[in-house]
Amino acid sequence: TLNLIPGMSKIQIRDLPEGVLFGNLESLFSQMLHNMGRMLPRAAAVLMNSFEELDPTIVSDLNSKFNNILCIGPFNLVSPPPPVPDTYGCMAWLDKQKPASVAYISFGSVATPPPHELVALAEALEASKVPFLWSLKDHSKVHLPNGFLDRTKSHGIVLSWAPQVEILEHAALGVFVTHCGWNSILESIVGGVPMICRPFFGDQRLNGRMVEDVWEIGLLMDGGVLTKNGAIDGLNQILLQGKGKKMRENIKRLKELAKGATEPKGSSSKSFTELANLVRSRGSYEN
């Protein structure tokens, strides 16, 4: 584990993105990280889509190394996205479900699990009878088990796009099956919804480790792979067992901290004011 880095003691070496300590160290991604590492100490300020209360030890350590670490998020609270049409009737369907009972599944706009994992997840959803909303690209639906859509239409919806922010903030949501992209994690925190994590690349493994072992607001799939039994177990733990209740308590605490950070006297609002003052002062200096 990364014991030498404050706030990272539960992070394992294998959780780091490829191109940092292993993998192709000559890749464009690795070179970008290297160049970023050289530039950050020279920056007048480093902006983060986060809030100080989420990782106070990490933020404090970064502030000791760089000029100004300014947490000015979560962006989805600071500048909420405009409402979108409920094309598929998601919200009306959610209104009919019990509180904290629905699984929402989305792996972002870039990655999709391989076919055998899609099958495993579909089988888990069918066997568990958990109400679900699944945002799945049209070209991936061919990998679902034959007859799955018909057999689950009474308790689930599969759609090609979903209004994620609105869904995660609905009272019926009980768990978010996610790729652990940073925006999705913040949206889940703001919605107060625990997560089942299936990371793919970049910072996603590290994010998933934070979710499970540091913040204790979700579960990582064993080996980072979706299996039928693993998915059923994860759904049961979060939706039906005491462990899930504790996760909901933890994430609701973070939700309140996130909201507080974006209040007029909150940490993120103060950081944004500091950023504005910095920009004005440098503009005056250059003039």
Curated annotation (Swiss-Prot):
This enzyme catalyses: an anthocyanidin + UDP-alpha-D-glucose + H(+) = an anthocyanidin 3-O-beta-D-glucoside + UDP
What's any GO biological process attached to this entry?
anthocyanin-containing compound biosynthetic process
User: What Enzyme Commission number(s) apply to this enzyme?
Assistant: 2.4.1.115
Q: Which tissues express it?
A: Expressed in cotyledons, hypocotyls, roots and leaves.
- Pathway involvement of the protein, from the record: Pigment biosynthesis; anthocyanin biosynthesis
- Keyword hit for Transferase: yes
Supply the enzyme class, top level.
Answer: transferase
Binding-site list for an anthocyanidin: 202
Pfam families in the cross-refs? UDPGT (PF00201)
Provide any one GO MF term from the record: anthocyanidin 3-O-glucosyltransferase activity
Q: Which residues bind UDP-alpha-D-glucose?
A: 162, 164, 179, 182-184, 187, 203-204
| PROSITE patterns, per database record | UDPGT
- Which keywords has UniProt assigned to this entry? Glycosyltransferase, Transferase
* The protein's role, per its UniProt record: In the presence of other necessary color factors, this glycosylation reaction allows the accumulation of anthocyanin pigments.
| PANTHER family registered for this protein in UniProt | ISOFLAVONE 7-O-GLUCOSYLTRANSFERASE 1-LIKE, UDP-GLYCOSYLTRANSFERASE 72B1
Its family? Belongs to the UDP-glycosyltransferase family.
Protein name per the record = Anthocyanidin 3-O-glucosyltransferase 7
Task: Cite the source lineage.
Answer: Eukaryota, Viridiplantae, Streptophyta, Embryophyta, Tracheophyta
